[in-house]
Regions:
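Mid-chain, well-packed structural core segment of small domains
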Residues: 68-87
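A short, acidic/glycine-rich surface segment
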Residues: 39-40, 59-65
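Core segments of cupin and vicinal oxygen chelate
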Residues: 10-51
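Short acidic/glycine-enriched loop/turn segments that link adjacent beta-strands
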Residues: 37-41, 72, 102-105
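N-terminal beta-strand motif that seeds the catalytic metal site of vicinal oxygen chelate
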Residues: 1-18, 74-78
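Short glycine-enriched loop/turn motifs at secondary-structure junctions
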Residues: 3-5, 68-73, 100-101
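Vicinal oxygen chelate
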Residues: 2, 87-121
């Protein structure tokens, strides 16, 4: 048996619409329209051949007390084609980020619910 790829990553959110404003409005991801009724709010977003699933469910995993730098927290890493454009979008939206401490062209930010994201050029 061989695992071929990652199909999706799930992210717990408190407010789907607020999260869509970040993931679609700021980051430019596209929302899929084929999400079935799963009995709770949420959204599926397309990221290349993979997806991010936003789950509006009770979050039993508090985000308080997590490291300020997302690289020291659990996070999802995404490849970007234009690092400077991403930084401009985050700046315009007032979203704080930190640069990678590894020397790579990468940055870390958090979504509206405190979930850490890494973007690598």
């Amino acid at each position: 048996m061989k695992i071929n790829s990652i199909l999706h990553a799930s992210v717990v959110v408190a407010d789907t619409e607020k999260s869509l404003a970040f993931y679609c409005g700021v980051l430019g991801l596209q929302q899929r329209t084929d999400r079935p009724d799963l009995g709770y709010p949420g959204a599926w977003l397309q990221v290349g051949e993979q997806q991010i699933h936003l789950l509006q469910v009770e979050n039993v995993d508090p985000v308080t007390g997590r490291p300020a730098h997302g690289g020291r927290d659990r996070h999802t890493a995404l490849a970007v084609s234009d690092f400077d454009e991403l930084a401009r979008r985050l700046d315009k939206a007032g979203i704080a980020y930190t640069l990678s401490r590894s020397g790579r062209r990468a940055l870390f930010c958090r979504d509206p619910d405190g979930n850490a994201l890494e973007f690598v050029a």
